Amino acid sequence: MTFANLTCICGLCLLTSMSAAAQIAPPQVPENLQVPNTETVLLKALGKGKQIYVCSAKPGDASQFAWVLDRPQADLIGDKGEAIGKHYKGPVWEAPDGSKVGGQVQARAAAPNANAVPWLLLKAASHDGKGTFSGVTYIQRVDTEGGLAPTTGCDKSHAGAEASTDYQATYFFYGSQTPETPLQSLPYSPSLDLTDMDPSVNPCEDFYRYSCGGWLKKNPIPSDQSSWSVYSKLTQDNERFLWGILEDTAKPNPARSTVEREIGDFFAACMDESAVEKTGAGPVSLELSAIGQLKSVADFPEVLAREHLAQNFGMLFSFSASQDYADSSREIAFAGAGGLGLPDRDYYTKSDAKSEEIRMKYVAHVQHMLELLGGSPAQSAKEARAIMDIETALAKASLTRVEQRDPYKLFHKMDRAQLQALTPALNWTRYLKASGLGELNEYNVTEPAFFKELQTLLAATPLADWKAYMRWHVVHARAAYLSPAFVDANFEFFGKYLRGTPEQRPRWKRCVQYVDGDLGEALGQVFVERTFGPDMKARTLTMTKEIEKAMEDDIKQLPWMSEATKQQALLKLHSVTNKIGYPDKWRDYSSIRIDRADFAGNVERADVFEGRRQLAKIGKPVDRGEWGMTPPTVNAYYDPQMNDINFPAGVLQPPVFDPKMDDAPNYGDTGGTIGHELTHGFDDEGRQFDAHGNLHDWWTEADAKEFQKRADCVADQYGQYTVVDDIKINSRLTLGEDVADLGGEILAYMAWKDATRDQKLSPIDGFTPEQRFFIGFAQWACGDERAESKRVHAITDPHSPPEYRINGVAANMPEFAAAFACKVGQPMVRKDPCRVW
């Protein structure tokens, strides 16, 4: 909502004070003082005056007296020093136009200044008159100074006396935004935005804050998000555009194409909240009934097979098709660890106070979900503890995420007899038959120790505990698709508590995500038709070829690598396949029955379709044209066994890739991302696969040692950075991404310099081309994250936090130091910079 529109509607008289309201950033406040993301700042005012106290008897003890706040008495002052209202008893705020808003305190937080009254969140409780304050919904009081009650002079003899103290505070007045609406076209945002910068920061001290400080002030984390970034905003724009597509295709028009009918009916079923609410736990009743009828562990194979198909292989262990590490041209069966409800095995094994608190809250959540399925509180509590015991045992038997980065630790070929010997209690023949597979005699068992522990558990754990475990995982996997009681409980723990997200996302956002997740290439087909032209694909491919040429030149001149290893590296580089925008062949979903009145059923049928499609690959040649992301996705990836880089259409949009912008920021941003994905083929994990995607050591011993030495330099650097509180980056987990960030930006700089070597480049907006390159690089990463979510990512995410992805790279590049005249001794210049590629 712009204030100009508001003045036309409401006849406001304070245009000079409020004309820039849409540009007022909300303050940084504790979580309990945050305003719902449906609201926006209408007005910011400084309140200066007095807090007036009355000497009164304490409640419940008439012999004791204390100063009690009676009322504020303050003037409201605008940014230019003009009077814009009064603040008085109620509490009430009144504008010169006669409009008033009364507030009711919702939450408070201690002021950083111990000598000041607390910060407050108030909700509008009353309105009077039309004008400035008639649309206000929330008020925040922040940045308080003074105003505390007197400490002396109040006793029985002074009963009724008044005393006042001077105070001032900043007040933010909020009103409802114009509701989010579907987009008919994608909005434009430049890849380099000067207003996103903070010129008060020295780029040689903190380049990330210099480049992104303005963005951070303008873009507080929305209340339905655990983090917010440039990529998040682009994702939301894409989602709003997809929303428009889905609303249109959801209309039962007989002229709809097959693809439009599929995605439209799926979306319509999801948006029918009244129908979903009536289902309760009904959509999982068949699964729960099958679990209830289990007589022994011997009956598990059929139930597990069904749930693996319906839950994407999540219960107890994982079973899937994947490329053979020894021969990437074919798919074989993979059996791996699984069965956990928390995001990572470390949540079960760490002994710090926060981890113990999370486990306690998790058990309470499991209990609550079991109660929603009809269990008594006492029985559900007992079952939740048993479930925690099972999952803890599975977690302790699982590899850490760092260990999983070594493909050799995940490569253990076995025949069926060997797999059966690991878990005698589980009949694999029955499991395969129930999964729709014939007899298989070749498996990669990624973690044999896990299956040994699973056998111990199967033999020792009471059947009743296993039934409780299975019921929990059924409802856990399906919670988001059930009635509101399950949706809300699931969000309360995993969203609000674990990640610190104050509010659930609106229904339309979730439904867009579900369509993209289950019918992604159908939705992507329509997205591409409307957003991604051949010119964008051609430009991206041209830049990719330039980055590949830079990497070829880089490999050839590496002083630390032998000629033998260089030849193998070049062979691998020249074998990389570039996938840009969308797949050459679209997936056919026509065999999925989609019912406009059965949302949960649609989800399950789509998941079973995908599960069967994946399992059908076992024993067959690899389809090298397949994509692992849907076209609207705002992301990119490298696949070490496919040896390909993939850039969906969704990420090739402004501000990430900006055809209107000069080359420098585009190379700094998208060029760096292309280089990043290419470098993944040669990071600590990718380098272990050859040009064909096979797990094969093509390095000389001396070159491998030198690579490790250089990679250790990066790990040592990033291991010093703090994520949140006292938690440091797990730099062995993030090593691949950190190496790719650094290598990718070096390659992008080389390619940009080569592409523009015959051009005379001039400064733009006061910045040299080199400076614009690096600012463009930094601004792709502008973003913020809630503390709770940072803790999750410190354990689970192989990416470093955004500020270190920028500063960590820039500090290692002499080109950056030269561009901004930074000197050794400043934070953004490392005395001994790291470089791998």
Where are these regions (language model features)?
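Primary mode marks residue(s) on the alpha4-beta5-alpha5 output face of response regulator receiver
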Residues: 23-52, 59-178
